[in-house]
Design a protein with these regions (language model features):
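Conserved N-terminal phosphate-binding loop of PLP-dependent enzymes in the Aspartate aminotransferase
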Residues: 1-424
Length: 424
């Protein structure tokens, strides 16, 4: 394996930590060190590790049917659960990852709208589809004018012809967003956004009036609005869209809806989802996959999601607030400049002088000093008993108040060590 592992986001030196076992909110590495897990496999383990009900149903299902070319009952049950829970979703299709869900959603939106171009946030993250990963982390010399941001490939070898199919707009700038979408109205058929904001640990969140304005203009221009809730579905019983009462045309999902096993899903209105239907002959969008809707992921997902009651989400929100309050105190007590941003079970620790409103503000506030502190905290937290990536804390129902308080103390210890010159 190049560099010794399969996920570049896990880069640590001189080598990554290898997991050996885990239970609840505790994960133990190959050297026998146990830490509180605030990553939860990139937000997919909302009940933590080895949730008994999920493990039991997976074991039962494994003895009956691992996978098959035919659909199974679990697929129907999970689809019904998602339709009943998410207000904008009338129908669902399953796949195997959030990246795949976004790719299929774009296909559906293009087929429905008859337009090929896609619009997304500058700095927005939507998985590894090469169209959507463009301009995820662009640098200032590549940005171009704010009113017409340049599209920059994220990986070498991305065809220019593909990049030409993407349009960018800034977060939390309603006039510029409206102008860009209106200017490209004849070509853009899909607009995709994580309703939280830039997502993936950035801590830069969308303002409600921006999301409302985006819904209004996309409806006016006949564009399919896609909410990427692969991460943000965990912020509430009906996802982020349920929290803010803004309904998209399509929703993409993944991570927690699989109960810890691989999964992705696209859900939406009957009108848009009809592009997958075979009832009237050959469908506009042909969608299939070897492991799509496999009964193992469906069973694990249905069981995990059934345990996520409104009370469970209330508990996760209280957990996130307790952590947020504690981290804020830790910053104040140690004299560091920074902010703590919380949305439900996701909490970000930012070492910026001000709260950034979009990608460009975030970039400019990541000064060498702020970046050094952020990296030092990230490097010291494993030594203090925490598993955290990018200073983003992703909670689970397995984490107790005692775990939260211990985590706050660990962060404060790391900050004090940095004050003493360690880790920087």
């Amino acid at each position: 394996m190049p560099s010794g592992y399969t996920r570049n986001m896990l880069v640590t030196h001189p080598h990554p930590l290898y997991a050996a076992q885990a239970n609840g909110c505790l994960i133990t590495d190959a050297d026998g060190q146990t830490r509180i897990d605030w990553v939860n496999n990139f937000a997919s383990l909302i009940h933590g590790h080895n949730k008994r009900e999920v493990v039991d149903i997976v074991a039962q299902q494994a003895s009956r049917l691992l996978s098959a070319t035919m659909p199974a009952e679990w697929e129907v049950r999970l689809a019904e659960l998602l339709v009943n829970r998410i207000s904008s979703v009338d129908a669902v299709r399953f796949m195997n990852s959030g990246t795949e869900a976004n790719l299929i959603a774009i296909k559906a939106a293009r087929a429905f709208s008859g337009r090929s171009k896609v619009a997304k946030l500058e700095g927005g993250y939507h998985g590894q589809y090469d169209l959507l990963e463009a301009s995820y982390l662009p640098r200032p010399e590549d940005w171009g004018d704010r009113s017409s941001p340049r599209v920059i490939a994220h990986n070498a070898g991305t065809p220019q012809s593909l990049l030409d199919e993407l349009v960018l707009f800034p977060l939390n700038d309603i006039p510029t967003m409206r102008e860009i979408l209106t200017r490209n109205a004849k070509e853009v058929g899909a607009v995709i956004i994580d309703p939280i904001g830039l997502s993936l640990g950035s801590g830069v969140y969308a303002e409600l009036d921006f999301i409302e304005a985006l819904r209004e203009i996309t409806k006016k221009l006949g564009m399919v609005l896609i909410f990427d809730e692969v991460w943000s579905l965990r912020t509430g019983y009906g996802g982020t869209q349920g929290n803010i009462s803004v309904m998209p045309d399509l929703t993409t999902m993944g991570k927690m809806i699989g109960g810890g096993l691989p999964i992705g899903a696209v859900g939406g209105t009957h009108e848009v989802m009809s592009v997958f239907s075979v009832e009237n002959g050959e469908p506009p969008v042909k969608h299939s996959g070897t492991f799509t809707g496999n009964p193992m992921s469906m069973a694990a997902g249905y069981t995990a999601m059934s345990l996520l009651t409104p009370d469970a989400f209330d508990g996760l929100a209280r957990q996130g607030q307790r952590l947020s309050d504690g981290l804020t105190r830790a910053l104040q007590d140690t004299g560091f400049s920074g902010h703590v941003v919380n949305r439900g079970s996701m909490t970000n620790l930012l070492f910026t002088p001000h709260m950034p409103k979009d990608y460009r503000e975030l970039f400019y506030q990541q000064t060498p000093e702020a970046t050094a502190v952020s990296r030092a905290v990230q490097a010291l937290l494993p030594e203090e008993g925490l598993h955290v990536l990018r200073n983003m804390f992703v909670g689970s129902t397995a984490i107790t108040d005692d775990h939260v308080d211990a985590s706050v103390e660990a962060v404060e210890r790391a900050l004090r060590r940095i004050k003493e010159g360690q880790g920087v």
